[in-house]
Swiss-Prot record:
One of its GO terms (biological process) is negative regulation of transcription by RNA polymerase II. Keywords: DNA-binding, Isopeptide bond, Metal-binding, Nucleus, Phosphoprotein, Repressor, Transcription, Transcription regulation, Ubl conjugation, Zinc, Zinc-finger. Its main location: nucleus. This is Histone deacetylase complex subunit SAP30. There is a cross-link at residues 87, 194, 205, 214 (Glycyl lysine isopeptide (Lys-Gly) (interchain with G-Cter in SUMO2)). It comes from Homo sapiens. The keyword Repressor applies. The modification Phosphoserine is found at residues 131, 138. It is found in: Nucleus. It comes from the Eukaryota.
Amino acid sequence: MNGFTPDEMSRGGDAAAAVAAVVAAAAAAASAGNGTGAGTGAEVPGAGAVSAAGPPGAAGPGPGQLCCLREDGERCGRAAGNASFSKRIQKSISQKKVKIELDKSARHLYICDYHKNLIQSVRNRRKRKGSDDDGGDSPVQDIDTPEVDLYQLQVNTLRRYKRHFKLPTRPGLNKAQLVEIVGCHFRSIPVNEKDTLTYFIYSVKNDKNKSDLKVDSGVH
């Protein structure tokens, strides 16, 4: 349920199918991990357990993982939750006096509930300020679009996405680097929202991802 084939993305339009397939796979990975601490992504509340880093390929914070952020130069000691950090979030708060950044030694991208709430409040203040400045309508760039947590996907799924779209990368990338590259491309795909939603609903109703995965696993 965490994979998709190039054929799947070509039916109903490459872009719409690709977006629908990635969203479906990320949602499925999150649902499958509900009993073990996996979550749905950047803006979803959740709770994790306490302490250091786990394997970079884990879907959701592992037992004993700490928040991946540094604040004022010090690594956060709070338990990692289900929300994840990204360069997009870093950019959205870079204009504020919030001295938080990703700890380069962290082997995951999950953050604690404290920092998740802090980031949300900073972004909300930014949106309100934009609304006040222009008389009620926030600038387009300040609209907080839903975030798909690509870190929930398996490494093989990310590699298949990279191969399908022929994304230029160097060999030996780890999961965090793949997520960043795939995420930048994924957010840049122009799609028709109606087509994407229609394809997504169709895939879910027909359990399409699961059947495609069985066929694809037989090929590989």
